[in-house]
A protein has these predicted regions:
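A short, exposed loop/beta-hairpin motif centered on an aromatic-Gly-Thr core
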Residues: 36-42
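Charged interaction scaffolds used for protein-protein
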Residues: 1-36, 47-77
Length: 77
């Protein structure tokens, strides 16, 4: 992934966080556990987080919980 595409993913992740607030921050924190933030994710992890946030937005609009959508994962185990 080149630097421009990477920055585009980071920008969209920030957009989702600003628009939806805490629910999106929860998913971002889950993906970045043990790291300094989205910028520290590997390319595939960054792309996965962006995809998860797109799905999370759909869930919020459709009234589907993140648990039911499989977006919340166990941290240990």
């Amino acid at each position: 992934m080149d630097a421009i595409v990477r920055e585009s993913h980071c920008r969209m992740i920030r957009h989702y966080r600003r628009r939806w607030g805490y629910p999106m921050q929860l998913l971002i924190d889950q993906a970045c556990f043990g790291r300094t933030g989205p910028e520290a994710l590997a390319d595939d992890e960054l792309e996965r987080l962006h995809q998860d946030l797109e799905r999370a937005q759909e869930c919020m609009l459709e009234g589907i919980s993140f648990e039911d959508a499989g977006l919340l994962r166990a941290r240990y185990g």
